[in-house]
């Protein structure tokens, strides 16, 4: 992967499996857009108790030249109650990929105008 990838984890065990999943998903983003300047993935399990939805917070911040900042996230309380962390990560990366493809499409249209 050529994109500078930063992974921060809080109150969740940082396993090789977790890191590999994030790296694989980030590489997929790079295939959607080959000029990502930065990718920061934050994964945490806040201490507050959630009555519904996932207990995890996952956020992806992407920097795309010339000056675009894309954010895809899922907050505690969103999604399914017993959703596993890997499912939440996949879901948020899917959101990021949709945003990225939309941006790339707009950039292509603008360059052909």
Give a label for each model feature.
Residues 1-113:
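N-terminal, polar/charged subdomain of small-to-medium soluble alpha/beta proteins
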């Amino acid at each position: 992967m050529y994109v500078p990838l930063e992974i921060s984890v809080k109150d969740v065990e940082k396993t090789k499996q977790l890191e590999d999943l994030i790296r694989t998903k980030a590489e997929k983003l790079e295939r959607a857009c080959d000029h990502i300047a930065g990718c920061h993935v934050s994964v945490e399990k806040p201490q507050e108790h959630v009555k519904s939805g996932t207990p995890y917070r996952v956020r992806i911040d992407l920097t795309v030249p010339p000056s675009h900042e894309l954010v895809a996230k899922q907050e505690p309380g969103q999604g399914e109650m017993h959703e596993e962390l890997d499912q939440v990560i996949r879901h948020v990366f899917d959101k990021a990929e949709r945003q990225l493809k939309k941006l790339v499409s707009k950039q292509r249209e603008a360059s052909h105008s």
